[in-house]
Amino acid sequence: MKLHRLPALLPLLASSLSAGSLLWAANAQAAAAQPADNAADAQTRCSDLKEVELPDVVIQRVKWVQRGGLAQDPNSAFTGASGQTLQAEEHCVVRGEIEPRTGADGRHYGTQFELRLPARWNHKFLFQGGGGTDGFVADALGRIPTRGSSAPPALLRGYAVVSMDGGHQGRDTIFGKDQQARLDLAYA
């Protein structure tokens, strides 16, 4: 990945996906005013994200999540967030990868991400960092990374939230043998 691209690419990705979903922001605002009439529209806009094409980005999965409980965060020990089960509103989950490639060491690299777009979006965006050497994609909920925090996660407050793995998979430091992987992590 080019040195300057990652910090700008994730917000661009979120806005591009939002624009590609038939003006998610405008429709989300309308959905807040008339939730019963627009629930199907939000689900359709989510499904439409499968068709969005961006250079060097592979959309791997798009899923609509109905209102209800979300599983406990399996990465809470690494992120410091509460592992409590959450009651979330309807939202769209997009998983993908930015600039997939084979590294100098023959391993697969690329910045995997998860983006969650709430049906009732507040027009704000939160980038959720991974910490340490990354290597995993935490659920993009925007949980408060303080043990014992009772504050609601950003997604429950209407934020679009994205998380990513720092450009490599695994919690070890073997990726450090690949110079581009080191740079990707540094700029993530």
Predicted regions and their residues:
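Bacterial N-terminal signal peptides
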Residues: 10-24
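Cap/lid segment of the alpha/beta-hydrolase catalytic domain
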Residues: 122, 130-188
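Signal peptide processing junction and immediate N-terminal pro/mature segment
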Residues: 20-34
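Catalytic-loop region of hydrolases
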Residues: 30-124, 137, 148
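N-terminal secretory signal peptides that target proteins for export/translocation
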Residues: 1-8
